[in-house]
Amino acid sequence: MNKIRCALIGPGNIGTDLLYKLRRSDILEPVWMVGVEPTSEGLARARELGLKTTSDGIDGLLPHLEADDIRIAFDATSAYVHAEHSAKLTARGVRVIDLTPAAIGPFCVPPVNLAAHIGSNEMNVNMVTCGGQATIPMVYAVSRVQPVAYGEIVATVSSRSVGPGTRRNIDEFTRTTAGAIEAVGGARQGKAIIVINPAEPPLIMRDTIHCLTEDAPDVAAITASVHDMIAEVRKYVPGYTLKNGPVFDGKRVSIFLEVEGLGDYLPKYAGNLDIMTASAARTAECIAAAMRAGSPETATA
């Protein structure tokens, strides 16, 4: 059966790592890589792997969408330009998976709400942030047991894994992640903190999640829920590991994670980028399965 053809916008760290994952997919075929710098290493690497490339940005891709049957596009550029990209692509019937913090479309965290997005047939879904993909499943694991008044996450990532796009979007990162802690994670109030650690050798991504429950926490039920969710995330991010917890202190529930990447293009310590690209690939594969089946209800997370 024919694969669903895709374009990637942004040949940086995230776009290139995502390309490696898509090349392994049984249902997705990466066809185009889009950039703005003619001398970009990412564009050169994509050409070496057999993709068509353009350094003319989104406008260099648009004339080829129909001829190359591009059905899904991944935007791994910047929150500042995503709105333009999304408008031009969705107007031409292309589904957009947004890996920037722009959050034009609804948030998607695969083990929490991907199935609902497949059924609603949205043209744009937002993958929140790397910190959001790592921590929101844990907030939800608590909130599905009992109400969470406050959820706070701290994502600690290696400085080497944080490219210029992420650094420009730090404010958007914190706002978008906090919003998704509430909208997807189920906390009444959310807060997100990112720590960029310059240590050498680089440290693997570490995440700390604190939830304040409204009532005394159900220790057994929350513990079981957390372990179940860890298993769900590990289906597509094998390096997603519970290092400690859940730890209970009054109404506070604390969970400590480590996220190691697969090492496709990026080093294994860059689990923050790997969980983002793995989540985007999983989302696209489920959307593609629905496209092939011709019915949104046939694909599940």
Curated annotation (Swiss-Prot):
The keyword Aminoacyl-tRNA synthetase does not apply. InterPro entries: Acetaldehyde_dehydrogenase, Acetylaldehyde_DH_C, NAD(P)-bd_dom_sf, Semialdehyde_DH_NAD-bd. This is Acetaldehyde dehydrogenase. It comes from the Bacteria. NAD(+) binds at residues 161-169, 272. GO terms for molecular function: acetaldehyde dehydrogenase (acetylating) activity; NAD binding. The active site is at residue 130. It comes from Cupriavidus taiwanensis (strain DSM 17343 / BCRC 17206 / CCUG 44338 / CIP 107171 / LMG 19424 / R1). It is an enzyme of class 1 (oxidoreductase).
